[in-house]
From Swiss-Prot:
It holds the Pfam family Glyco_transf_43. Its main location: Golgi. Glycans are attached at N91, N206, N280, N309. Keywords: Cell wall biogenesis/degradation, Glycoprotein, Glycosyltransferase, Golgi apparatus, Membrane, Signal-anchor, Transferase, Transmembrane, Transmembrane helix. It is found in: Golgi apparatus membrane. This is Probable beta-1,4-xylosyltransferase IRX9H. One of its GO terms (biological process) is cell wall organization. Residues 1-31 are annotated as: Disordered.
């Protein structure tokens, strides 16, 4: 019977003999660690599928991905439990504290100042070194300008002149224009084009039997201010007067009641007279007067020569006013006494008044009485009756 002998391939010969070296056996003590690491690496490579094992492929294609998933899952779980950051030591007493503590801020930020941000005349200041908040913003007082008007030849000219003056005044300014019976379309058009914040009111009183229409028109404005509790300085500015910008700038300095001298033309139109207070600084000590018929008045002031705080109308307790009835102008008094009768309801005497400007040394407005004739057209231009004439068309 023939025997078959299997010879070793030359590639498995020990290469140390070929080079002339002597063959040495493996020592267990020196290479045990290397042997263990090589076994772990071989097992890991087999598990991860780096080397292909035909026996493992026969067992099932799902085992190798399952073991791979299991190894990476355990590796990620161990890494997730490993603390990489620093943990602050919290005292046991603070663990269940419900107080909200401020975040830690470096000390160098505490001494830092924030610059002021200025916008026009308004400045805002944030926190300073001491931690105090300072606000330099002071809102300006509202100027409530009341102007009664009526239909006449120069009405549009007067209203536009007052409107152009008010446009140059610093805001806030509210222009209250009061008409009688009905608000005319022409007046509404003028007010819309002025560029001034306005309110167009109508006096519902019958003007035919009224002695002074301006009294009731101003009372309509006072009722409106009291109803809506407008907070500001009220000034009666007739449309036929001439005003300076310095006057409106000085009105915001009034705390309760302010007055100033008004220049006007005499009846002869050939000289100017002065009516108003005599002041020592801001204190009123006397009055200018030129008409003998008006010397019996308590206060010698023109209607456009004073202004007052609007809270007097709707908050009398603030000023300790003794009157329980509303503050209004009176139509029952003699002509020329409307001003003094109204002022007596606002203040008791000169000690509650303020002279504007200081020492009352400037003329801030003029009352000229330069009204045109009531007839809007010269004589002969208007015909009382229509001509009853018919012209046949050819």
């Amino acid at each position: 019977m023939a025997s078959i002998r299997r010879t070793l391939s030359p590639m498995y010969h020990d290469r140390s003999h070929e080079n002339g070296g002597s063959h040495k056996g493996f020592t267990i003590g020196g290479s045990s660690s290397k042997h263990n690491s090589s076994q772990f690496l071989s097992y890991l490579t087999k598990l991860l599928g780096v080397t292909s094992d035909p026996k493992s492929s026969r067992r099932g294609p799902w085992r190798r991905p399952f073991y791979q998933f299991l190894v990476f899952f355990l590796l990620g779980f161990v890494l997730g439990l490993t603390p990489f950051g620093k943990m602050e030591d919290v005292n046991g007493s603070d663990r269940f504290s419900f107080e909200i503590k401020q975040p830690y801020v470096e000390e160098r930020l505490e001494n830092r100042k924030r610059e002021e941000a200025a916008v026009d005349a308004v400045s805002f200041v944030a926190e300073t070194e001491n931690g105090k908040k300072e606000v330099n913003f002071v809102p300006k007082k509202l100027l409530i300008v009341v102007t009664p008007t009526y239909n006449r030849a120069m009405q549009a000219y007067y209203l536009n002149r007052v409107a152009q003056t008010l446009r140059l005044v610093e805001s806030p300014v509210l222009w209250i224009v009061v008409e009688g019976n009905v608000a005319s379309f022409e007046t509404s058009e003028i007010l819309r084009k002025t560029g001034v914040m306005y309110r167009h009111l109508v006096c519902k009183r019958n003007m035919t039997s009224i002695k002074d229409r301006g009294v009731h028109q101003r009372n309509t404005a006072l009722e409106h201010i009291e109803l809506h509790k407008l907070d500001g300085i009220v000034y009666f500015a007739d449309d036929d007067n001439i005003y300076s910008l310095e006057l409106f700038q000085s009105l915001r300095q009034i705390s309760r009641f302010g007055t100033w001298p008004v220049a006007m033309l005499a009846q002869s139109k050939n000289k100017a007279i002065l009516e108003g207070p005599v002041c020592n600084g801001s204190q009123v000590i006397g009055w200018h007067t030129n008409e003998k018929s008006k010397r019996l008045r308590r206060f010698h002031v023109d209607m456009s020569g004073f202004a007052f705080n609007s809270t007097i109308l709707w908050d009398p307790k603030r000023w300790r006013r003794p009157f329980s009835h509303p503050t209004r102008q009176l139509d029952t008094v003699k002509e020329g006494f409307q001003e003094t009768s109204f002022i007596e309801q606002v203040v008791a005497d000169e000690s509650e008044m303020e002279g504007v400007p200081p020492a009352c040394s400037s003329i801030l407005n003029w009352h000229l009485h330069l009204d045109a004739l009531d007839v809007p057209y010269p004589q002969g231009w208007a015909i009382q009756k229509n001509l009853q004439a018919l012209i046949t068309m050819k």
